[in-house]
Amino acid sequence: MGYDVHQLVAGRDLWIGGIKIEHELGLLGHSDADVLIHAICDAILGAANMRDIGYHFPDTSAETDGMDSKIILRDTIALIATKGYHLVNVDATICAERPKMNPHIPAMQQCMAEVIGTDPDNISIKATTTEKLGFTGRQEGISAYAVALIEK
């Protein structure tokens, strides 16, 4: 299972699922802070018993500063391939009060499927709110959860 969370701040672009979403706030992070891709990569790496994205793409590295998370996703797929695995499917949930994610889900699926080299039907993405509860409900951040099925 993968999980990630990033704080919403002014002055940053909002990248989720590999696409830029128009919004007055963006996610703060060392890379582009794509919370969905980060959760998916953690799920994929975890399924292969290969630790997490922080281990492979540390936020202390100059190489990952401002990195496009689609590169992290591409490289994660290459990493699991070194152990003979390939991705079967992903099931992910984005938790955000605003902006509404549902209109963007098909573009996210298409974008990530192209990076991974799979059919968009293998990338399940759902969106929910926290009914105005917690940091997500107060629009202080966005989180994402993911599980991945891999096979040899």
Each PLM stretch: what is its role?
Residues 1-106, 115-116:
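RNase III-family endoribonuclease catalytic core
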Residues 105-109, 139:
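Short, low-complexity, polybasic intrinsically disordered segments
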Residues 112:
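Glycine-rich, mobile lid/loop segments that gate access to catalytic sites or pores
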Residues 119-122:
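Short acidic capping loops at alpha-helix termini that bridge into adjacent secondary structure
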Residues 125-129:
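Pyridoxal 5′-phosphate
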Residues 132-134:
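Short acidic, Gly/Pro-enriched loop/turn segments at secondary-structure junctions
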Residues 136-152:
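C-terminal edge-of-domain segments
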